Swiss-Prot record:
This is UPF0391 membrane protein Swit_2334. One of its GO terms (cellular component) is plasma membrane. The lineage of its organism: Bacteria, Pseudomonadati, Pseudomonadota, Alphaproteobacteria, Sphingomonadales. It is found in: Cell membrane. It comes from Rhizorhabdus wittichii (strain DSM 6014 / CCUG 31198 / JCM 15750 / NBRC 105917 / EY 4224 / RW1). It is a multi-pass membrane protein.
């Protein structure tokens, strides 16, 4: 997902530099959304791994 965020960011910056500000802004906005979704998923999965690891180590 971070790969797509980076691709949309680069495309948005290129479009903005070429004068297509509206479309470029939309791509940059989409890149921001994808970036924050990826960060949120990372945090959720890190917490799940932390709590699952504690339960497994407690039961052994």
């Amino acid at each position: 997902m971070l790969k797509w965020a980076l691709i949309f960011l680069v495309v948005g910056l290129v479009l903005g530099a070429l004068g297509f500000g509206g479309i470029g802004g939309a791509f940059v906005g989409l890149a921001k959304i994808l970036f924050f979704i990826a960060i949120a998923l990372f945090i959720v999965f890190a917490l799940l791994a932390l709590f699952a690891g504690k339960k497994i180590s407690d039961s052994i």
